[in-house]
Each structure stands twice: as structure tokens, then as C-alpha cells.
């Protein structure tokens, strides 16, 4: 059994034209003397006398397509080196042989299967099927490159100017707020209620205005007739204290909480 061969030419006929051998040598890039020729390959029982992956290129000139069975395609793949080329020439007299051969090559694991007219001038071998063995060996492994996902980069424009927050403040914003004086409403008997009064002075003044009385008349009530402090039953029609509760002279009149409420 031959160990290796630059190129191998096989045929199921008794002889192989020299032109076909030359075509294989030219396609394989070797000299004609480096091509090993095997005739009547059908008698080999589908076996080729070569080691595994020991042949660079194979040319098969097959007259009968039935001689190119699946077993023979597998044998060609066995002796071919990884990435090796195979050329198959068949007779055009067979019914659409190229499609059948292409299908067998594809099922046999070959790639880049193409059909073209043969360069040989032999009219009996005018259809050429070209294919290529895969460049990797069965059982070989290689690492897969995992895509690394990086964090998105934030583009920071150093030329951009930052706004000073203090520049957004006005002069009024910078002024110190004036706090209200605690208990200011209670200072002095003649003080008026402030705008946002919460101590009750505003309500008291509203009651006084309704009665048309002065603060002095409320805080220190006096009666010329002596009946004003006894109640409405003893007051005259022009009494300024009419409608107020009874009181003692000189004591502050206590107005009820519902004094301003409307009578139903």
C-alpha cells in the first residue's frame, strides 16, 4: 500500500487518457510524473491502497455512474487530505449524471461542489464535477470566541461650562428673612391686629366694629343710667350695649364665641 501521493487518478476503464492525467496535474499544481494512476477501480471493491489523508488531489474518470457509489465516495474522502480537491469526470451519455454525482458528494461531506464542462477533448468524458474536502478533520476542536459585552462609555465634554448655582440667586434671595416678633399682637392695648393674625385680636376687633363700640367701652364699660349692665330687658333703645350680655361696671365685657354667627 502506497503511503502518500501528490495526486491520484482513478478510472473504471482499462486505460486513462494522458490528457486527463495532465488536467489533474495542472489543477493540483504538480507534475504529471507525481500523479498515481489506478485503472479498473471497480475491481478494488471500493477500497483504495492509500493511507488516511495521504493524497493531495483525486481525479476520478468514471464511465458508469453506478461504479461511483457511496462507499467509493467515502473512500475518496478518507484518502484525501483536509482541504484536498476532487475532480470527477463522467460520460454525458448517462441520464443527468452530474446531479446524481453532486448529490453524492454533498452527502459525503464535500463542499464547494460545482459542475462544469471538462477541459479534456475526449468526447466520452465531457462533464466534470469539482468539489473540496473540508479543511478540518473529524474530531478536531477549536475555541469559540465569546463576544464581550462592555459597559457603554459616557462621552464627557470637558469643554462644557458648569453653571454656578449662586449666580442664579437674586439680591432678594440673598436677604436674610425677617422673623415675626413673638407676641407682638399683645403689646399695647391700642395695637391693631396684624395682617395674618392668629391670636384672636382680629376677631375681637370685628365684633367691636359690628357694635360700633370703642375698645375703651369694651374693656371698661360704664353706664350713665345704671341699667346698661343689667341686660337688654333694662336697656333703653339707644343703649350702645344693646345686644351684649350683662356685665358689671368697670369689668371687661366677655363676648361669646358665636356672637357673629347668624341667627336662624
UniProtKB/Swiss-Prot annotation:
Residues binding [4Fe-4S] cluster, per UniProt: 225, 228, 236, 239
Ranges where the record places region Fe-S binding site B: 225-239
Binding annotation for [2Fe-2S] cluster: 185, 194, 197, 199
Region described as N-terminal SAM-like domain: spans on this chain: 1-142
One GO CC annotation: mitochondrial intermembrane space
Principal location listed in the UniProt entry: cytoplasm
Subcellular location: Cytoplasm; Mitochondrion intermembrane space
Claim: Transmembrane is one of the keywords in the record: no
Motif (Cx2C motif 2): 236-239
Cofactor: [2Fe-2S] cluster; [4Fe-4S] cluster
UniProt keywords, alphabetically: 2Fe-2S, 4Fe-4S, Cytoplasm, Iron, Iron-sulfur, Metal-binding, Mitochondrion
Gene Ontology molecular functions: 2 iron, 2 sulfur cluster binding; 4 iron, 4 sulfur cluster binding; electron transfer activity; metal ion binding
Motif (Cx2C motif 1): 225-228
Region span, Fe-S binding site A: 185-199
Region feature (Linker): 143-174
Record carries keyword GTP-binding: no
Signal peptide positions (record): none
Gene3D superfamilies (UniProt xref): Vaccinia Virus protein VP39 (3.40.50.150)
Domain-level remarks: The C-terminal domain binds 2 Fe-S clusters but is otherwise mostly in an intrinsically disordered conformation. The N-terminal domain has structural similarity with S-adenosyl-L-methionine-dependent methyltransferases, but does not bind S-adenosyl-L-methionine. It is required for correct assembly of the 2 Fe-S clusters.
Subunit structure: Monomer.
Family note: Belongs to the anamorsin family.
Function: Component of the cytosolic iron-sulfur (Fe-S) protein assembly (CIA) machinery. Required for the maturation of extramitochondrial Fe-S proteins. Part of an electron transfer chain functioning in an early step of cytosolic Fe-S biogenesis, facilitating the de novo assembly of a [4Fe-4S] cluster on the cytosolic Fe-S scaffold complex. Electrons are transferred from NADPH via a FAD- and FMN-containing diflavin oxidoreductase.
Name assigned to this protein: Anamorsin homolog 2
Top-level taxonomy: Eukaryota, Viridiplantae, Streptophyta, Embryophyta, Tracheophyta
Amino acid at each position: 500500500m502506497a503511503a502518500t501521493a501528490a495526486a491520484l487518478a482513478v478510472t473504471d476503464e482499462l486505460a486513462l487518457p494522458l490528457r486527463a492525467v495532465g488536467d489533474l496535474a495542472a489543477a493540483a499544481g504538480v507534475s504529471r510524473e507525481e500523479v498515481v494512476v489506478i485503472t479498473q477501480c471497480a475491481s478494488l471493491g471500493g477500497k483504495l491502497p492509500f493511507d488516511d489523508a495521504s493524497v493531495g488531489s483525486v481525479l476520478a474518470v468514471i464511465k458508469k455512474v453506478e461504479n461511483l457509489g457511496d462507499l467509493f465516495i467515502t473512500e475518496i474522502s478518507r484518502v484525501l487530505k483536509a482541504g484536498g480537491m476532487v475532480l470527477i469526470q463522467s460520460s454525458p451519455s448517462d441520464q443527468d449524471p452530474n446531479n446524481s454525482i453532486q448529490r453524492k458528494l454533498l452527502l459525503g461531506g464535500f463542499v464547494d461542489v460545482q459542475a462544469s464542462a471538462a477541459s479534456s477533448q475526449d468526447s466520452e468524458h465531457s462533464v466534470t464535477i469539482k468539489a473540496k474536502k473540508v479543511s478540518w478533520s473529524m474530531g478536531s476542536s477549536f475555541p469559540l470566541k465569546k463576544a464581550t459585552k462592555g459597559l457603554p462609555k459616557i462621552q464627557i465634554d470637558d469643554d462644557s461650562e458648569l453653571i454656578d448655582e449662586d449666580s442664579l440667586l437674586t439680591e432678594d434671595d440673598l436677604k436674610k428673612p425677617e422673623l415675626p416678633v413673638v407676641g407682638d399682637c399683645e403689646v399695647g392695648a391700642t395695637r391693631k391686629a396684624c395682617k395674618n393674625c392668629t391670636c384672636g385680636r382680629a376677631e375681637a376687633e370685628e365684633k367691636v366694629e359690628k357694635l360700633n363700640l370703642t375698645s375703651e367701652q369694651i374693656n371698661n364699660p360704664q353706664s350713665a343710667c345704671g341699667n346698661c349692665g343689667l341686660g337688654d330687658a333694662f336697656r333703653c333703645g339707644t343703649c350702645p350695649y344693646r345686644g351684649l350680655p350683662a356685665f358689671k361696671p368697670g369689668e371687661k365685657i366677655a363676648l361669646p364665641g358665636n356672637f357673629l354667627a347668624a341667627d336662624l
